Each structure stands twice: as C-alpha cells, then as structure tokens.
C-alpha cells in the first residue's frame, strides 16, 4: 500500500513537524507491530513545499534520513511529474487542508477509470488538533467531490470519538530508554549540555512564539526559585533568545536561573529533552503533543489569532486537561497556562507532575493517531 502525504508549511515547524512525525510513525508501523497494529508492505512518500524547514528537524537531510527510514521525501512540484501521476497513492493525506495539485487530483480520479476493478484512493484531510466538542461529530465525515471521489475529514483529538494524537516512538521514551542512568543515554546533540547542568537544578525547556511575554515570565520563575531555594536551568530551544536586559540579569551570581542556548535539534532529541525537563513551554501542534506524552507540566503558547479563536481552542483543551484534577490544581494550572506568575504554581509542581502522568495514561488508553488512521483505512478497504 502506498501512502502519499502532502504538507505545505504554514506554521513554520508545527505543520512540518506533524507531517514528518506521521510519516515516521507509519514507516515504523510498516516494519513492526506496535500495540497489535501493523501496516504491511507500506511505501510512504512525503511531499513538502519547503524542504529547508523539513531538513531542520530531520538531521539536516530530510531526503537522506527519510530514505534510511523507508520514507521518500519529495518536493511539492514532484507531485505533478509523470512518474508520480502514474502511481498516485492508495491512501492520500492532505495535511491541514493544503489543497492537492490539480493534476494529482485528476490522476486520483482517473485511477479507477483506467483499470477494471481498481479501487479509488482513500483521500483523507488531516485537520488541526482540537479539543472542541464539535470535532466528535465531524471526525471521519465524508465530503463527496465532483470527480466521484470522497474526501474524509480526520480530526485528531482527546476523546474516543476523535482520531487521537500522534505517538510515534514515544513508547521507547516512556519505557526508560532515555531516562536510565542519568543523562548517559542522552543523544549526542544534548549530552554535553545536560551534563553541564547544575546538580539538582530544575530544568525548563522553552520553545515559544515571539509574542510571548517571556522575559516577565522568566523573571517570575527566577523569583519563585529563589523563594524556594532552588536553581533552574532554562533551555532556550531552536536558537530562541531573550532581551539583553534579561540575559544580563540572569548572568549575575545571585540569579537562580541559568540560560542555556540550544540550536535546532532532531525531533527525537527534542522528545528526549522534554522527558528530562520538569516543565516545558511549547507552542505549535507537534511540540504541544510531545509535551503531553512527556507526562510533565507544560505551558502551551498557543498561536494568537486576530479573531481570538485561539482562546476558544485553548479553553476547550484546558477544560479537558484539568477535568480530573483537584480544584486547587485546576485553578492554579489555568492561571499558569495564561502566563500567571510562577510564584503561584511553583509550590504545586509535584501535584501537576502527577496529574500530567495521569493525563498521559489517558491519551494512551484512547489509542494513538497512527493506529487509528490505519484502522480507518483498513475498514475502508474492507467495505469497498
């Protein structure tokens, strides 16, 4: 079975991150059995309109590294080549309504007309992750097209009626491969940096949008840590930075916070970092989901929209995320997620960590996205 995944970069590394992780997850299922889900003899192609962005999160070489994983990474324009048009996917995933090239859509429609008994491609529109209630009803809804094909809307989510979230190789993280023996098992991109952290320091990873009030937030972290006699090593991921004034303040001897710059690192290395930090500040969909699999407290710097739709999306998630927590943690966590002072949530970090692990187990019980999407494809194959 051939899987074709189409990705256009909108949210910088968020869209690319999800598509690259999905391709890796499907490739992994094709070569092994994970949670009793198998994807036999699959061939995976990933079409992307900006391979430079993909390279950043794929060991600097998406094409080469993809090939080592059984993934053929191609530029968007390749989808209109005669070779590709003559072998369109059995399953076609357009990520985040990216609109497939017209010649490719025409080739999809012609696939059944040229060969007797040929099955049409299973066409899936992979939507953005949401916790809003309407996703339960919209998930897997078909949308008949005027060329005779149907497109199915696939909604990732946090309920049994939605499509789950991507797991990838996180079961290896949670099984202890990354966490045994201190930092001895850290990937090369992180080993020296982690070994240089101060003993018993709390660790925070930061991957944020430029609009975030990061300087003020870090100042509150510093004040909270000082009040509790603790030290904090803060990893500024992906070459992000803070103001010169903040850098100067945290370079003083009486500062609890130490800033550590990190370049872009591969996805699996970032997963490792999240797993060893005490709290993670994340932004786009991919890092947002990985923080949840880490089973650690996190703050979601959701991308702001002019119509304030992001507030609806954030509140819908927080309602589900803190649903089973104590009233005190819920109140504290809600404020923390909206950039509240660290002095308010710092005393509750242990309780928040325990809650985060419970939430991670809930996600696992719902089933992961790659397994659910494969189940859907198999059901379509049987019914056709």
Language model features with spans:
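Active-site and donor-binding regions of nucleotide-sugar-utilizing enzymes
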Residues: 6-148
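A nucleotide-sugar donor-handling region in carbohydrate enzymes
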Residues: 125-214
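Catalytic donor nucleotide-activated moiety binding site of glycosyltransferases and closely related
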Residues: 227-263
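Nucleotide-sugar donor-binding patch of glycosyltransferase catalytic domains
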Residues: 297-340
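C-terminal amphipathic helix plus adjacent low-complexity
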Residues: 323-384
